[in-house]
């Protein structure tokens, strides 16, 4: 008996996702498993070929968070062909300044941004603009240096 003839083919097919959003708490304690190379590898395998994963990376202004951000970025960058860190100001978060990760098998967050397609949607947002999108990926020099310290040459 093969699996298809018994109608069980779908059970054995791996689900694939367009987007994985990892909205975890701090990379310590119970959510520590969401910051491992194995977890990022599972996310990579679960994404479609043009899929994207985003995750929180903490604040660079606290030593423990900054070290965790570097570890996380190193693990993601070694797993995904495209890995970038972006920033946002969130007053209710510690230090009011937070970092996030963007990872993809295919798309670069700036080079592949289609601003005209976004404008064609004619959505009115109170926060997001394509200019803000691009600007979020331009990091201060101290952060660029922190990320370079852990990136492997490609």
Predicted regions and their residues:
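A short glycine-rich, Lys/Arg-flanked "PGG" loop and its adjoining helix->strand segment in the class I
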Residues: 37-49, 77
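Conserved S-adenosyl-L-methionine
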Residues: 81-91
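Glycine/threonine-rich flexible loop motifs
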Residues: 27-35
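SAM/dcSAM-binding transferase cores
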Residues: 95-154
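A short acidic, Gly/Pro-enriched loop at the edge of an enzyme's catalytic core
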Residues: 13-19
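Conserved class I S-adenosyl-L-methionine
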Residues: 31, 58-69
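Conserved beta-strand signature within the Rossmann-like core of class I S-adenosyl-L-methionine
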Residues: 50-57
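Single conserved hydrophobic/aromatic residue that forms the stacking wall/gate
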Residues: 1-12
């Amino acid at each position: 008996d093969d699996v298809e003839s018994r109608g069980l083919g779908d059970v054995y097919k791996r689900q694939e996702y367009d987007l994985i959003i990892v909205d975890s708490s701090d990379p310590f304690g119970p959510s520590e498993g969401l910051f491992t190379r194995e977890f990022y590898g599972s996310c990579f395998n679960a994404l479609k070929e043009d899929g994207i994963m985003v995750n929180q990376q903490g604040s660079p202004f606290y030593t423990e968070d900054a070290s965790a951000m570097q570890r996380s970025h190193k693990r993601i960058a070694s797993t995904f062909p495209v890995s970038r860190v972006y920033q946002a100001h969130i007053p209710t978060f510690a230090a009011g300044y937070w970092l996030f990760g963007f990872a993809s098998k295919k798309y670069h967050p700036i080079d592949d941004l289609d601003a005209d397609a976004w404008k064609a949607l004619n959505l009115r947002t109170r926060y997001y603009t394509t200019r803000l999108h691009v600007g979020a990926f331009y990091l201060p020099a101290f952060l660029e240096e922190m990320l370079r310290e852990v990136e492997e040459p490609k």
